[in-house]
Amino acid sequence: MAMARLGSWLGEAQWLALVSLFVAALATVGLYLAQWALARARPQPQRRAVEPGEGPRPGSDALLSWILTLGSWRSQWQAAWVTALNEEAERKGGPPFLSFEEDPRQQALELVVQEVSSVLRSAEEKVVVCHVVGQAIQFLVSETPALGAGCRLYDMRLSPFHLQLEFHMKEKREDLQISWSFISVPEMAVNIQPKALGEDQVAETSAMSDVLKDILKHLAGSASPSVVLITKPTTVKEAQNLQCAASTAQESCPPKPPRAHELKLLVRNIHVLLLSEPGASGHINAVCVVQLNDPVQRFSSTLTKNTPDLMWEEEFTFELNAKSKELHLQISEAGRSSEGLLATATVPLDLFKKQPSGPQSFTLTSGSACGSSVLGSVTAEFSYMEPGELKSWPIPPPVPAAKIEKDRTVMPCGTVVTTVTAVKTKPRVDVGRASPLSSDSPVKTPIKVKVIEKDISVQAIACRSAPVSKTLSSSDTELLVLNGSDPVAEVAIRQLSESSKLKLKSPRKKSTIIISGISKTSLSQDHDAALMQGYTASVDSTHQEDAPSHPERAAASAPPEEAESAQASLAPKPQEDELDSWDLEKEPQAAAWSSQVLLDPDGDELSESSMSVLEPGTAKKHKGGILRKGAKLFFRRRHQQKDPGMSQSHNDLVFLEQPEGSRRKGITLTRILNKKLLSRHRNKNTMNGAPVEPCT
């Protein structure tokens, strides 16, 4: 019994549990259905068209401002607006019939983003609307009153202008469509100025201006231009793959011609010929403006007076790219902005064929789109420069240079020793460069001469004999120095030694200085003037003069490894009747330096004090051919008689105040002594069989 009751209670409890679970399931399903029904019955929220109260969006403003600064946008949107205006004007019809063109003088515009709003059209498309403001925009408007009538050209300027831009972005699309519409605001000013205004158009200008303003505002407001920009993202790996593929293709293919952006266009020698004087009468200053459409580059020439024949020789270089299609040449009046345009010409560019090339002529018109009158012609020279092509400038041939050093030293006895050293530098010929003109070329290049004159220095020199010594200066100039044999020669040698110590920048080889003769000259004023002319002539001359060979040349020849031999020297030639002047020997033609040694124009008369320099013992110690290479010595008395109009030293003035008798007396005594010393020295050298050496 008990077991039966227990089984019935368990069955009832199980049944109650199953019923409870079923009721709970029904309640859950009912609650879900009720919520679904309520959700369906609830009204959906409306889509927001504009969000004015959200405040500024710096992120969106920066992004849109960056998009509006892209070169692809700047190069397309003005042309797209002009196309839309022409389509709207053609759809509207006329008269008047209007057509729009881009103004070549228009600079790149900066659009300022002011308000940004977002509108969600669908799940795959999003539209961003923004309000932008520009400073000013210009168009060229050609107006035809009736079909077949003459065209009139106007400048239309909107400042400032307001646009509403819409950016249409779609999912899974790689392009961005930008469309905009013109917003007419009260503060916008519309300026319309006719071009080439004649006297018969003055009365019609004000009447047509108001009519055109209304028409242009209506056309600008109804036109709907648009531009499509490609926005394809590229990863770093894709960019590297593209570069590798391009390099592989270039290795397998022959070298390609230079790209458009690597070319440069050179425009020069612009010649303008105007048929008549356009515009108002009067004197004007014409200027030529050359402008490239893309990338925008603008160059202006110098001012030219108002003449029918205008010429500009300036050179203008333009950077090119694949979008460089037109080059505008504008002749305008300086000082006037828009109404100063006199004539314009458009030059089409074909970068693939590199045309135009060379001198080309184009017609100058008023710039309107429909058949305007021809105002003249313009001729210019065009050339394309490839990368790596340098502008070829004429390189002048190397010019030999001659440096002349004049050094004066005053000895204690009053004798002035003047050393004139002439050094000619041959031009250096580098490997791979054009060689200079040779010596036997019919075209001779003048020698550049640099004269260096040092101040007078006073030196006390003892007259004692010493052996010959050899010195080597820092400039690799070999000097054979004779100490004490002759005070005058010693002074000259010391001057040459000091001048040779100047270190050269790039010494090539060893040079040798030869002093082949020493002579005293007593010159009058007439001979002074003659030597001055000879000094000038020797600087300008590039030819060598023939002269008899000197007997002492063999004893003082240069080393065989030297390519440049010694120059000639001075040799005294006393005359019986007139010993006041001593003739100077000319240089032999064998001198390899091909330059003349200059004479000292400041020769003096010898006075009686010259005996302190000349001693018989000194004259006996001369050795033939002591010194080496290219210097001539001229020495004189310190007291000289110059032209009173020339610069005089204190001693010169003292000498001029001396009486004539004392000077003649000193000259006579000097003649006698020099004559005796010269004959004695020559006789001794002849007996010993030595070559004759000039006596000092």
From Swiss-Prot:
Q: Which residues form a coiled coil?
A: none
A GO cellular component annotated for this chain's UniProt record is:
nucleus
Give the primary localization class: membrane
Domain of life (superkingdom): Eukaryota
Q: How does this protein sit in the membrane? A: Single-pass membrane protein
The residues covered by the C2 domain are 245-362
Tell me, what's a Pfam family for it? Answer: C2
Where on the chain is Phosphothreonine found, per UniProt?
T445
Q: Where is this region: Disordered?
A: 539-580
Q: Localized where?
A: Membrane
Record keyword Membrane present = yes
List where Basic and acidic residues composition bias occurs: 542-553
Renumbered to this chain, the Low complexity biased-composition regions fall at: 554-572
What protein name does the entry list?
C2 domain-containing protein 2
Natural source organism:
Homo sapiens (Human)
Q: What is the lineage of its organism?
A: Eukaryota, Metazoa, Chordata, Craniata, Vertebrata
